[in-house]
């Protein structure tokens, strides 16, 4: 009972001390349980009589001390919260601890906090604009995203010129550009190590750092997609050496390099290694570049016929100003050579081709020679030079190259050559009608096959016929007028007879003139007088017309671009050619025509089968794979 009374008296005295905050932990058994080591001791509510007065007083003293300590800390934190800033996205606990240690004269346990506070105090003392700095500390940018440990350490190395300037600039950066994604530690370590070198290095680095920090930070350009670590190392290790060499040799080159550094805009997507190597090559290998320029100018001049001094000067200026690469010059030389070769091939007289030797003809027109050939230009070169798709196709077509080499008029001649090689259409002494003959590729080959004992009559509505026009008729074959001209030419039956007739019109034969003057073959004037009344050409006109052996048709209408329309028009045109063949062909004759796939060609094929003993369809090797054209060959015409 006495113990309980004593405890109650102590509690009453505590109430008079206005320490109501202390009463709660003392009176509650839970707080005592938390202060003890084991919580299992207080499973039940203990009576107050079990605690002695000494224990209660000890708890009271401890709690009082802890509360006083918390009040002191709260006072300190209140002072700091007024000046608290978002310095480095780190908590201000380290700074507060270091302030407390400094006020209480405690030894330095954390070097980072004390050094950082000293650095900031020094900066505030050195800079006259302390008010501006204090205002700026309220809006310190999120600059580095890393700790300022390296910055503070580098400040202690007595390198005040660069670092003080950089710290002030960093404090003044209100917009806080996201400049380096790498740590600032690398930047400052490299600069601090380089500052221990010679004065020449320090001059270059200070200029470069001022440019990088002063200009590029304001614009906040996307300077490097690479880390700044590589750029700074390469610049410090390689570019400084280049600039030192240039300073010793040429004073002018340093100014140009500084101007180029001011324009460091489009540096991304390339590493600094390439830039530094190019600077070395441009500065150290000037003589090599001049030699290469002279060689390139000589190569350009080799392609021109006129080698005047004005042209040389123009090319030199063109080379120095625009810096033409070697690849374009190579292409220009090749194209000029190819143009000369094409001009030479086109200038050849196409009439002076002779296939009199049968062996030579087989060497030119066999399948092996023109099946896997090359075009006039390689495909890669043609794609770089020629823009027109049709010209690209022509320049890379092997049959075009073969036609120029063998002095043929067009590549279409190889179509009839392929058909003749397989079916053997033509023989010497035949009469052939070529419908749609212009420009004369088929007619030239067929005339060589039938020889001068045969005859090829060429008909076309176009006047672009590049052969001798003695056997050419300009007109529409469906008209009776042109058909009569064709029948008149068939009276000659051979090319030799036709040439003799043309020659007689120009230079009359002396024997014929004597017969006309004497009135007869005996010279007595008692002849029948037919030669006197009739002109000279009636001698050939007395011959009767004959039917032809072969009718070929490579005609095509003007294309509209609509596949079905063009197909039906082509079938109609070849049907007219077939009706013409019915009039002119002899029994056992041959008909060759071009059609396209589209549906209507099947009916036309059946029409051929009803008039010819054998009918074949064929796609020549010279016909392009993307084309829908095919050729129908009807042999052994039945006749009426």
From Swiss-Prot:
One GO biological process term: RNA methylation
InterPro entries: RNA_methyltr_RlmE, RNA_MeTrfase_FtsJ_dom, rRNA-MeTfrase_E, SAM-dependent_MTases_sf
Binding site for S-adenosyl-L-methionine: 439-442, 460, 476-477, 554
Annotated PANTHER family: RIBOSOMAL RNA METHYLTRANSFERASE, RRNA METHYLTRANSFERASE 2, MITOCHONDRIAL
Composition skew (Low complexity), residue ranges: 242-262
Gene (name only): fsjB
Record region (Disordered): 175-206, 242-264
One of the Pfam families matching this protein, by short name: FtsJ
Reported function: S-adenosyl-L-methionine-dependent 2'-O-ribose methyltransferase that catalyzes the formation of a 2'-O-methyluridine in the mitochondrial large subunit ribosomal RNA (mtLSU rRNA), a universally conserved modification in the peptidyl transferase domain of the mtLSU rRNA.
Location of the transit peptide in the chain: 1-31
Disulfide bonds: none
GO CC terms, sorted: mitochondrion
Keyword Protein biosynthesis: no
Polar residues compositional bias, start-end: 180-192
Name of the featured protein: rRNA methyltransferase 2, mitochondrial
Localization annotation: Mitochondrion
EC number: 2.1.1.-
Protein family: Belongs to the class I-like SAM-binding methyltransferase superfamily. RNA methyltransferase RlmE family.
Residues at the catalytic site: 594 (proton acceptor)
Upper classification of the organism: Eukaryota, Amoebozoa, Evosea, Eumycetozoa, Dictyostelia
Keyword Cytoplasm in record: no
Reaction(s) catalysed (UniProt annotation): a uridine in rRNA + S-adenosyl-L-methionine = a 2'-O-methyluridine in rRNA + S-adenosyl-L-homocysteine + H(+)
GO MF entries: rRNA (uridine-2'-O-)-methyltransferase activity; rRNA methyltransferase activity
Enzyme class: transferase
Matches recorded under Gene3D superfamilies: Vaccinia Virus protein VP39
Keyword terms, alphabetized: Methyltransferase, Mitochondrion, rRNA processing, S-adenosyl-L-methionine, Transferase, Transit peptide
């Amino acid at each position: 009972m006495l113990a309980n009374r004593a405890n109650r008296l102590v509690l009453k005295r505590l109430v008079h001390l206005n320490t109501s905050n202390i009463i709660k932990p003392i009176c509650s058994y839970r707080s005592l349980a938390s202060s003890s080591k084991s919580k299992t001791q207080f499973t039940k509510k203990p009576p107050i009589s079990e605690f002695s007065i000494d224990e209660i007083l000890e708890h009271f003293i401890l709690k009082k001390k802890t509360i006083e300590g918390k009040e002191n800390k709260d006072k300190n934190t209140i002072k700091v919260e007024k000046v608290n800033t978002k310095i480095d996205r780190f908590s201000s606990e380290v700074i507060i601890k270091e302030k407390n240690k400094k006020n209480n004269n405690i030894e330095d346990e954390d070097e980072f906090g004390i050094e950082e506070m000293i650095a900031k105090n020094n900066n505030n003392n050195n800079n006259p604009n302390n008010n501006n700095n204090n205002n700026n500390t309220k809006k310190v940018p999120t600059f580095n995203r890393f700790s300022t440990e390296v910055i503070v350490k580098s400040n202690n190395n007595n390198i005040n010129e660069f670092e003080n300037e950089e710290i002030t600039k960093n404090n003044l950066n209100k917009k806080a550009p996201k400049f380096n994604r790498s740590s600032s530690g690398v930047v400052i370590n490299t600069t601090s190590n380089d500052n221990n070198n010679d004065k020449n290095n320090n001059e270059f680095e200070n200029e470069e750092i001022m440019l990088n920090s002063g200009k590029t930070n304001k614009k906040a350009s996307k300077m490097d997609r690479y880390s700044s670590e590589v750029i700074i190392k390469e610049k410090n290790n390689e570019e400084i050496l280049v600039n030192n060499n240039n300073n010793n040799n040429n004073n002018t080159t340093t100014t140009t390099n500084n101007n180029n550094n001011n324009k460091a805009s489009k540096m991304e997507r390339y590493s600094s290694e390439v830039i530094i190597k190019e600077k070395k090559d441009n500065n150290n290998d000037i003589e090599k570049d001049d030699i290469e320029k002279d060689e390139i100018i000589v190569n350009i001049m080799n392609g021109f016929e006129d080698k005047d001094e004005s042209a040389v000067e123009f090319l030199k200026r063109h080379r120095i100003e625009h810096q033409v690469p070697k690849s374009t010059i190579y292409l220009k030389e090749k194209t000029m050579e190819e143009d000369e070769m094409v001009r030479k091939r086109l200038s050849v007289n196409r009439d002076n081709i002779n296939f009199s030797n049968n062996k030579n003809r087989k060497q030119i027109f066999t399948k092996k020679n023109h099946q896997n050939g090359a075009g006039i230009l390689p495909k890669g070169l043609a794609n770089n030079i020629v823009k027109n798709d049709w010209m690209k196709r022509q320049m890379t077509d092997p049959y075009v190259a073969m036609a120029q080499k063998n002095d043929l008029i067009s590549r279409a001649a190889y179509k009839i050559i392929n058909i003749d090689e397989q079916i053997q259409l033509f023989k010497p002494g035949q009469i052939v009608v070529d419908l749609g003959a212009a420009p004369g590729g088929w007619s030239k080959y067929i005339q060589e096959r039938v020889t001068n004992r045969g005859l090829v009559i060429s008909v076309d509505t176009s006047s672009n016929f590049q052969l001798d026009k003695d056997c050419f008729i300009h007109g529409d074959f469906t008209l009776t007028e042109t058909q009569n001209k064709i029948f008149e030419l068939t009276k000659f039956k051979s090319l030799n007879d036709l040439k003799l007739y043309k020659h007689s019109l120009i230079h009359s034969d002396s024997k014929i003139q004597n017969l006309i003057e004497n009135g007869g073959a005996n010279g007595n004037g008692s002849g029948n007088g037919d030669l006197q009344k009739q002109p000279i050409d009636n001698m050939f006109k007395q011959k009767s017309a004959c039917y032809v052996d072969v009718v070929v048709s490579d005609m095509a209408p003007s294309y509209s671009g609509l596949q079905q329309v063009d197909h039906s028009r082509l079938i109609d045109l070849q049907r007219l050619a077939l009706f013409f063949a019915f009039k002119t062909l002899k029994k056992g004759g041959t008909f060759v025509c071009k059609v396209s796939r589209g549906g209507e060609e099947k009916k036309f094929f059946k029409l051929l089968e009803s008039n010819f003993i054998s009918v074949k369809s064929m796609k020549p090797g010279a016909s392009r794979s993307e084309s829908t054209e095919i050729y129908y060959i009807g042999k052994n015409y039945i006749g009426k």
